[in-house]
Swiss-Prot record:
Residues 60-155 are annotated as: Disordered. It holds the Pfam family DUF5568. Residues 78-92 have a biased composition (Basic residues). Belongs to the UPF0461 family. It comes from the Eukaryota. The lineage of its organism: Eukaryota, Metazoa, Chordata, Craniata, Vertebrata. Coiled coil: none annotated. Residues 60-69, 94-107 have a biased composition (Polar residues). This is UPF0461 protein C5orf24 homolog. InterPro entries: DUF5568.
Amino acid sequence: MMRPVSSNNVAFCASGKSSCLSQDPMRGVDQFGLYPTQQSKFSHTVTHKNISCQTQEAINETHLQTSTSRDLDTKSDLKKKKNVGRSGKRGRPSGTTKSAGYRTSTGRPLGTTKAAGFKTSPGRPLGTTKAAGYKVSPGRPPGKKQQALMCSSDA
């Protein structure tokens, strides 16, 4: 800040200059050649935009409405995304082959009919029949039990 300090009737500024511009007898403020249009360029008035409480509440309400609708969308998306990796409720994951041995949607092994009623593996590779000669679950070849009964009846 520059304040005129008078000593011995000579005007001094606090900054140490011999005179202030406002008290300079050589040039007045009007002599600097600033026209009214130029003065408006250099003298800016700062105005602050006041946001009323009503507009802030309206902004908050619209934000709440959009967030709740987003929440509903994400909940429905989560339900859709939950079963993305599977072909059905109990089916095999998508991208796997039938030979991988996944059960069908009814719970029975692939390659079996519904009438067979399998709930576990039949004891032979899936897709094969009993006539192929594979051992069944108890560990004997198919048809062996019938031959044993015939032999015992002959004796």
